[in-house]
Swiss-Prot record:
Lineage: Bacteria, Bacillati, Bacillota, Bacilli, Bacillales
Highest taxon listed in the record's lineage: Bacteria
Functional note: Probably deamidates glutamine residues to glutamate on methyl-accepting chemotaxis receptors (MCPs), playing an important role in chemotaxis.
GO molecular function: protein-glutamine glutaminase activity
Top EC class, one word: hydrolase
Entry protein name: Probable chemoreceptor glutamine deamidase CheD
Any Pfam family matching the protein: CheD
Gene of this entry: cheD
Amino acid sequence: MSTAQAVKIGIAEMEVVIAPNVIRTCGLGSCVGVVIYDAGKAVAGMAHVMLPHSSMARGGVINAAKYADTAVEALVQLVIAAGGRKGMLKAKLAGGAQMFSFSTVGGDMMRIGARNVEEVKKQLERLHIPVVAEDVGGHSGRTIEFNPQTGVLSIRTAAQEIKEI
């Protein structure tokens, strides 16, 4: 009997797992699922990022997992605290869809999915963490699950077969 658990994270949450546990999130539309992992230690973290910049926050307390500019570094720290090695970390991304069609009204502000992906990649580059695989953009929502033992990110998109990256 397996003792593996599937840890589920919601919107604007992040968590870390160690194999044999897996981690998953659903409802990735314009949000981005960021996975940072150390394959050699079989440890991984996932964040469900909702918005690109913490400057969009209202009020005094910022939920680091909600924003791309704060979630990536916070997730790296959690993975390292769980045994990940800074120089061995890699990233996989999914999400960042354009879920609705907008006219030119709003312009760049309405491209939340693309802006989320851009900011996540910017933060990963700043921290020297390579993106080794991604499934981003498009117009469909996604559910993802990462297995730190195999390093496989499984992606389920509406009306499509499960993709593994």
